[in-house]
């Protein structure tokens, strides 16, 4: 972030249920995050920002812009998933998974297994970094601490994700975008080119770029370089 802060005013937020934010017991929906993003921009930033998203959070920005056409100046999405992955809706099976994860004992146990230190390390090394040795003990501790803050209440967000409550179709919103949408994908990720092309085919103004030797973790230095060019 220090590289970006030299050239831009940067706001970074932990969304509700994530990181060091509060993790209340509720159903986390896509619309909840759309509204949180909209309110943050109106109440804190006070002007149209360039928004940078990672992974699934592209849906919050795209849908927020769709609901408020003058909200954003541009969207840069880093390693977004395929658009059709957002088309899922809660069904009987996913609702059962959500209910199980919210149970006091069983749900907490399943969450603690998922967020065990060894599983966090494995995920970071295999998915978020192209070179496993870049995963430091300090980084691992930060992820572990954040996932277990609030007596493992992060399980409520995980339950909503597994229940597909955080999903919402974005194809129509991408098609209607009139602001710049930049898609940045890691070349090492499966189907990266196909995913980026799917956004470009939906809206001809979408611009795509690729970063080599990177996993899912955002690369601020590379992003700054791409912005400059």
Where are these regions (language model features)?
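Conserved loop-alpha-helix segment in the C-terminal half of the alpha/beta-hydrolase fold
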Residues: 178, 182-214
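Short amphipathic alpha-helix adjacent to the substrate-entry channel of hydrolases
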Residues: 1-9
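Conserved alpha/beta-hydrolase catalytic His-Asp/Glu region
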Residues: 86-89, 112-175
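Flexible "cap/lid" loop of the alpha/beta hydrolase fold
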Residues: 66, 76-106
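Short glycine-enriched nucleophile-adjacent loop
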Residues: 58-69, 75
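Catalytic histidine-centered segment of alpha/beta-hydrolase-like enzymes
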Residues: 214-223
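Active-site loop/oxyanion-hole signature of alpha/beta-hydrolase fold enzymes
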Residues: 12-52, 56
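Conserved small/polar residues in nucleotide/adenosyl-binding loops
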Residues: 224-229
């Amino acid at each position: 972030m220090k590289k970006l802060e030299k050239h831009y005013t940067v706001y970074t937020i932990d969304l509700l249920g994530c990181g060091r934010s509060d993790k209340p017991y509720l159903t986390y929906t896509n619309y909840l995050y759309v509204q949180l993003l909209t309110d943050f921009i109106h109440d804190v930033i006070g002007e149209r920002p360039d928004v940078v998203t990672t992974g699934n959070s592209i849906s919050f920005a795209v849908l927020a812009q769709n609901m408020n056409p003058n909200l954003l100046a541009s969207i840069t999405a880093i390693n977004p998933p395929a658009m059709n992955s957002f088309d899922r809706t809660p069904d009987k099976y996913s609702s059962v998974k959500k209910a199980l994860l919210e149970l006091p004992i069983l749900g907490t146990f399943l969450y603690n297994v998922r967020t065990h230190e060894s599983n966090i390390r494995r995920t970071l090394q295999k998915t978020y970094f192209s070179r496993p040795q870049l995963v430091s003990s300090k980084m691992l501790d930060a992820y572990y601490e954040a996932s277990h803050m609030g007596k493992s209440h992060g399980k409520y967000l995980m339950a909503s994700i597994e229940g597909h409550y955080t999903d919402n179709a974005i194809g129509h919103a991408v098609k209607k975008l009139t602001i710049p949408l930049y898609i940045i994908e890691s070349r090492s990720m499966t189907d990266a080119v196909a995913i980026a092309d799917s956004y470009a085919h939906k809206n001809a103004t979408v611009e795509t770029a690729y970063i080599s030797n990177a996993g899912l973790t955002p690369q601020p230095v590379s992003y700054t370089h791409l912005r400059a060019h």
